[in-house]
Amino acid sequence: VNIMAFLMKQTRVGVRLVEKAGPIVETKLSDTYISLFLLAVCCGMLMYIAVATFKKQPNILGTIAVFLCVSVFILAGFEHCIANMFYFGLVSTPTKYAVPLLIMILGNSTGGILLCKLTQHVQIQKNSENA
């Protein structure tokens, strides 16, 4: 991802990307760790919903679910570690973003795992009631 950020900085749009991304990255890097973690958990949950829905409905409905989940995480300002890697690589150095990025990775993973386990638990409960 940082390779892509480096390559984009070499293009005619690189200066504008850096100008636009700079304040966003500064806000993310100055946020508290708990805030980053909680926003990343929410994003992880949305990404789990998107993927799980598409697996169940690999058609236009699943595609719409993915589109909606991604739109919500962007509009809500949730933290997605992969998306942030690109922006961090544009305007910051690894020493400045390593810890926040690690927190986002943990938050994204936690959100997805929690929702996955909750879904499995509900399904097991339904199956045991029907048996």
Region roles according to the model:
Residues V1-A131:
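Alpha-helical transmembrane segments and their helix-helix packing motifs
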